[in-house]
Amino acid sequence: DLITNSYTRGKPRHVTSWPKLRALGNCVPVPGQCIGNGCFCDREAPHGNCCDTDGCTSLFWCPGSKAG
């Protein structure tokens, strides 16, 4: 699915349910990754932290704020 297929840069995948992602709201860091507005991104990705005012960067799908 979209979460388990997220780019993790070799780190173990951290699977979180969509209801929990929604409940977390804005940026909440977890080991190696970042959750914000329903998105799930790698903070260490080449294009930087996904947790900005728009949620994920344009290269990461973010159902909370950007169309996929």
Curated annotation (Swiss-Prot):
Keyword match Transferase: no
Keywords tagged on the record: Disulfide bond, Neurotoxin, Secreted, Toxin
Tissue: Expressed by the venom duct.
GO molecular function (one): toxin activity
Post-translational modification: Contains 4 disulfide bonds.
Localization of this protein: Secreted
GO CC terms in record: extracellular region
Prodomain positions: 1-21
Domain of life assignment: Eukaryota
Domain notes: The cysteine framework is XII (C-C-C-C-CC-C-C).
Protein name, entry field: Conotoxin Cal12.1p3
Organism per entry: Californiconus californicus (California cone)
